[in-house]
């Protein structure tokens, strides 16, 4: 579950001087998951091209980061950041994945309200004003809105010359991105073949639009990487 306590846990862990930070773990995990789900892709260190792009959406224009190998056609990956949005850490994660042979679009989920980065370097979710600001934007990511966004992002990817549209799309989500990968898989089931969430929150609820209810609409292979504190706060979710 991705809530204010979890985010504070994340910051404490990342600042604790461990040998492997959550950021580094996520970078390694993302590459590993995509490699397993698309096993025929080479595990080389591709030379990449990167650019800031504007994607036309139903509700406006989304500023995104697009990074891909400098030659050839490659499977597409749609990356949803955590609640602090598109920022240098996620640009680095997208680049790392692109170096493994993927065309990666890292999106600004809050484009309706602000261009990325939506918070400054070092902003803490434990700060009340920062938390209030981010949560207000996150609440606008309803199922209807986020599924429309997913369709637009994948339409953008499929229109790129360096995307292999004969290969399925992968999607990754971090923290609040957990529900977004499920909605992506449900919104474009014929294109999304792999989905993974890390520390995802709000995957299961009693609401009529709970993300887990979209599972029958998806044909993707899915991995949810759940931490111990996630399970402690929502022990029944795994049994749904």
Over which residues does each language-model region extend?
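N-terminal cap/lid segment of alpha/beta-hydrolase-fold proteins
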Residues: 42-72
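Short beta-strand element of the alpha/beta-hydrolase
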Residues: 74-82
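Primarily recognizes the serine-hydrolase "nucleophile elbow" in alpha/beta-hydrolase
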Residues: 151-214
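Gly/Ser-rich "nucleophile elbow"/oxyanion-hole loop immediately N-terminal to the catalytic nucleophile
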Residues: 123-170
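Short amphipathic alpha-helix adjacent to the substrate-entry channel of hydrolases
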Residues: 88-107, 111-112, 117
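N-terminal secretory signal peptides
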Residues: 1-20
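N-terminal export leaders
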Residues: 20-35
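The feature captures the conserved acid-bearing segment of alpha/beta-hydrolase catalytic domains
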Residues: 202-240
């Amino acid at each position: 579950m991705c809530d204010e306590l979890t985010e504070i846990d994340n910051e404490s862990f990342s600042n604790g001087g461990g040998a492997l930070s959550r950021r580094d773990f996520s970078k390694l995990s993302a590459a590993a998951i995509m490699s397993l789900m698309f096993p025929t892709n080479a595990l080389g260190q591709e030379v990449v091209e990167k650019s800031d792009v504007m994607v036309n959406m139903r509700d406006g224009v989304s500023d995104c980061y697009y990074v891909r190998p400098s030659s050839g056609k490659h499977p597409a990956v749609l990356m949803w950041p955590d609640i602090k949005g598109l920022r240098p850490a996620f640009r680095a994660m997208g680049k790392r994945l692109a170096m493994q042979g993927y065309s990666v679009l890292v999106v600004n989920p809050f484009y309706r309200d602000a261009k990325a980065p939506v918070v400054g370097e070092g902003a803490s979710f434990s700060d009340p004003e920062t938390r209030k600001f981010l949560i207000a934007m996150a609440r606008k990511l309803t199922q209807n809105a986020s599924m429309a966004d997913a369709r637009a992002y994948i339409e953008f990817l499929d229109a790129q010359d360096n995307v292999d549209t004969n290969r399925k799309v992968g999607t990754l989500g971090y923290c609040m991105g957990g529900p977004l990968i499920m909605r992506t898989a449900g919104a474009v089931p014929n294109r999304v073949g792999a989905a993974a969430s890390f520390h995802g929150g709000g995957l299961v609820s009693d609401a009529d639009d709970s993300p887990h209810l979209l599972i029958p609409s998806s044909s993707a292979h899915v991995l949810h990487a759940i931490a111990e504190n996630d399970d402690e706060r929502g022990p029944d979710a795994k049994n749904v």
